[in-house]
Every structure is written in structure tokens, then in C-alpha cells.
Regions:
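Ligand-binding pockets and gating/stacking loops
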Residues: 1-169
Length: 169
């Protein structure tokens, strides 16, 4: 919560327009409350629950991170700016480093765009795009933020197709 407030204040005071915040690195020695092993080791050791379809202990950290992300968005939404809030006027791009932590999968990486981007972003959409390059989300974020980017990525990950479903006309 403290970091969420500090980042929001930095944006509100115009001390920064862009930031990168890493909650925890994939190989950091982060402990999940109630666990004796570090998070990274749990991702490898914990079996996938056959009924749930995921690793419940591993998912606890994801839940805590999402709570922090939600707190950050609330901080942005609480700051009045112009005819709306700071959240209405900015764009936040959040993502995980893997789709399935146990094997460090790069497929189905959860990615989120939040905020109104000054009216350029149509929030509230879930886009499921199996087999698509994750760089499409990055290109979309750049264009929503007003960057003159026509393409992004390299090799097989190169794309010139933003996700237009989330872009206001």
C-alpha cells in the first residue's frame, strides 16, 4: 500500500510520467506468508491440484500481488485530475512473468491494461487470444499512451496489429 500511494503521488505531482514497478522477481527470495520455502521453489515443487486445475499455494502470492495492484488503482482513482481522476487520464500495463509458473511457460501470460488513457482506452474488456503474440498487448499499450508506434517486437514476436477491441474510436 505504501508503494501504491508513493507511485500515485509521484504521478499526481508530475514527478514522473512513466514508471516500472516489479513486485517481485521470478527468482527472488520472496516468502509467501505461512510457507517455509521461497516462492520460486514452491512453484516447482507444488503439484497442480487436479480438481482446481492450478497450484493453490503458488496462487496465494498472485492473489497478494493482485490486491496490491487493486490498491494502486484505487489510489489513482482517488486523485482528482481535470474532469476525472488520475486513473481516467493514465494507462497502467500490468503482467506476470509466466503463464504457468511451474514450468516457466510463456504461453497464456496474464496481462492487464487499466485506466482510461484520457479516453483512448475502452476498459472492462477481457480479450482471450490463444496463439497470438504477447507483443500485441505492448503495441496496444504504446498506442493508447500516444506513442507513434506502428509495430513492436522482433522475429516471430513482431506485430503491427494492436488489440483494437480495447481502443476507443
Amino acid at each position: 500500500r505504501v508503494m501504491a500511494r508513493l507511485l500515485a503521488m509521484g504521478l499526481a505531482c508530475d514527478q514522473s510520467r512513466v514508471f516500472n514497478f516489479v513486485h517481485t522477481g521470478g527468482t527472488s527470495e520472496t516468502y509467501v506468508p505461512g510457507q517455509s520455502k521461497i516462492y520460486h521453489q514452491i512453484t516447482h515443487d507444488e503439484p497442480t491440484d487436479s480438481q482446481l486445475g492450478y497450484q493453490p499455494e503458488t496462487s496465494k502470492l498472485a492473489g497478494l500481488v493482485m490486491e496490491g495492484f487493486g490498491a494502486f488503482l484505487q489510489e489513482l482513482d482517488a486523485i482528482q485530475e481535470g474532469n476525472g481522476t488520475l486513473l481516467d487520464n493514465c494507462l497502467v500495463f500490468a503482467l506476470s512473468d509466466t503463464g504457468y509458473a511451474k514450468i516457466h511457460s510463456l504461453e497464456n501470460i496474464p496481462m492487464m491494461l487499466a485506466g482510461g488513457a484520457s479516453g483512448r482506452h475502452k476498459a472492462g474488456h477481457h480479450v482471450h487470444a490463444p496463439g497470438e503474440s504477447v507483443t500485441r498487448v505492448s503495441l496496444t499499450a504504446m498506442q493508447l499512451a500516444g506513442a507513434p508506434a506502428g509495430e513492436f517486437g522482433s522475429g516471430s514476436m513482431r506485430t503491427a496489429r494492436p488489440i483494437t477491441d480495447v481502443m476507443a474510436s
